[in-house]
Regions:
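Alpha-helix N-cap/N′ positions at the starts of helices
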Residues: 34-38, 49-53, 104-108, 118, ...
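DNA major-groove recognition helix of helix-turn-helix/homeodomain DNA-binding modules
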Residues: 91, 95, 147-169
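Short alpha-helical "recognition helix" segments of helix-turn-helix
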Residues: 122-128, 137
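Recognition helix of helix-turn-helix/homeodomain-like DNA-binding domains
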Residues: 131-147
């Protein structure tokens, strides 16, 4: 959009808004998802000041806060001087990542609950057999922290072993 001032002899100057003669530099990308834009287009979008484009970037960041677009935005924000949008996008990334990490801890907690249930062991016995304290297991189950990958493997193996023993006991006629 361009702004033009028209001056007339008898009247005060008037301001006329005219459509820009050139299409937006982002026009080539408008129909593509933001996730498929090159970094140069992300940079242009951040610098352009177009709210609708920023909204699309925010949606992409929330959808995948560690994905390609997030990395591109981080790269652009290192060099761009758009403080307002830069601060906002940084905040979106930070919050989206925190929410994702909380969701992942909750998912791990659900998996641990299922492993304990499947094993037939009490929580205390399960914790003892995987080599953690009851408090540590409680922290895993509350999604406060996540166990290491090695601990998850140990939990799955323990659950498998006790589930197999439980199945064999119920399969035997007494």
């Amino acid at each position: 959009m361009t702004l033009a001032v028209e001056a007339h002899d008898d009247a005060a100057p008037t301001v006329r808004l005219a459509a820009a003669a050139q299409p937006s530099s982002l026009a080539a990308y408008e129909k593509k998802p933001v996730e498929f834009w090159p970094t140069a287009a992300i940079r242009l979008a951040v610098e352009s000041g177009e709210l609708e484009v920023w909204k699309r970037i925010v949606v992409a960041l929330k959808r995948d806060p560690y994905g390609r677009t997030a990395r591109q935005v981080e790269e652009v924000l290192e060099t761009v001087s758009s403080y307002g949008i830069g601060k906002a996008l940084t905040e979106v990334l930070s919050r989206s990542r925190a929410e994702l990490e909380a969701d992942e801890r909750a998912e791990v907690a659900r998996q641990i609950h299922a492993l304990i249930d499947r094993s037939g062991l009490s929580g205390r016995e399960f914790a003892s057999r995987i080599g953690v304290s009851g408090d540590d297991l409680a922290a895993f189950l509350a999604a406060d922290v996540s166990p290491s990958a090695a601990q998850m493997v140990r939990m799955r193996r323990l659950s498998d072993r006790f589930a197999k023993m439980k199945a064999q006991r119920t399969a035997r006629p007494e």
